[in-house]
Amino acid sequence: MKITYKSAGVDVDEGQRAVQLMKNHVKSTFNSNVLADIGGFGGLFSLNIKDYKEPVLVAGTDGVGTKLKIAFMMDKHDTIGQDCVAMCVNDILCQGGKPLFFLDYVATGKLVGEKIAQIVGGIAEGCRKAGSALIGGETAEMPGLYAENEYDLAGFAVGIVDREQIITGANIKAGDIILGLPSNGIHSNGYSLVRKLFFEVLDMKITDYVEEFGTTLGEELLKPTKIYVKEILSLIEAIPVKGISHITGGGFFENIPRILPENVDAKINVDAWQIPPIFKFMAEKGNMSKDDIFGTFNMGIGMVVVVSKEDVNGAIAVLNKAGQEAHIIGEVVEGAKQVIL
């Protein structure tokens, strides 16, 4: 019996076909700093640092978690890549990092060229929104490790910031104002709880229309994570921003304290913005306490920005001009690095 790589479950030809199908998506993210075409052993990116006194690279990596299961259930793969980009670039934004380039990793049980091209198309869309070049990636076919129709997805973002412009939160003090930037739904965390509630406890189907959402359950759950790059960079250029927090896993209680000094609390007014129906629905149907749901989900606020009281009106004006809605959702008070609802 003749043994081949294909008979072992790895189709090299299909991998090459996938590269051809995704090529235009990848190239659509290129800019003049990209020095190598697709297919090299490494991505090459020329750093233009003439505008930086002491340039510092900022790097972040993340995945999409079990939101992938929603994409599998819907057989819709063209937006999940944007989630991956958003999770990475929004993180490096928190320290003032301007995204430069991105790399992706896709691993699957059985490689299907069209599906990979859809995934990479979503990654490319996210990169264009973030102003980031997609300069490299890996697509791995791993039979026996992943189910045939499933895949995992991870991304890696690198950005740049001037050392003296790094945002740390160290200068946050009592009296500062907390701004909230609306999310686009659940974003990309908490989906193990989401799936348990909707598909096990409530026994709902992905195709069910939910009146409160104005759409099907699947469409609501697969809304792509918002990318805040252009809006936040506009703000940083105009206003001395003291702290930025990306509200992801752990919700308000884990992410906001990451930027707080030891001697202050973040006092949040939960009536300051309209909490989206998806979160109200989950809180009611899942019998979740306020602490539970605010400690898991973004509750309609994807990014938190801290500025001084005298800069708050200017900050809101800059964000609004960039097309970004912003709410005053709280203030910094004396305390012990806690979030108070």
UniProtKB/Swiss-Prot annotation:
Recorded GO molecular functions are: ATP binding; phosphoribosylamine-glycine ligase activity; phosphoribosylformylglycinamidine cyclo-ligase activity
**What is an example of a Pfam family matching this protein?**
AIRS
Similarity field = Belongs to the AIR synthase family.
This entry carries the following GO cellular component terms, namely: cytosol
| Top EC category | ligase
What InterPro entries has UniProt attached to this entry?
A: PurM-like_C_dom, PurM-like_C_sf, PurM-like_N, PurM-like_N_sf, PurM_cligase
Write out the entry's keywords from A to Z. Answer: ATP-binding, Cytoplasm, Ligase, Nucleotide-binding, Purine biosynthesis
- HAMAP family tied to this protein: AIRS
Q: Which reaction does it catalyse?
A: 2-formamido-N(1)-(5-O-phospho-beta-D-ribosyl)acetamidine + ATP = 5-amino-1-(5-phospho-beta-D-ribosyl)imidazole + ADP + phosphate + H(+)
Location(s) in or outside the cell: Cytoplasm
EC number assigned by the record: 6.3.3.1
Is ATP-binding among this UniProt entry's keywords? yes
The annotated pathway is:
Purine metabolism; IMP biosynthesis via de novo pathway; 5-amino-1-(5-phospho-D-ribosyl)imidazole from N(2)-formyl-N(1)-(5-phospho-D-ribosyl)glycinamide: step 2/2
**A GO biological process held by the record:** adenine biosynthetic process
Could you tell me which Gene3D superfamilies the record lists for this protein?
PurM-like C-terminal domain, PurM-like, N-terminal domain
What is the protein name for this chain?
Phosphoribosylformylglycinamidine cyclo-ligase
Q: Report the SS bond pairs.
A: none
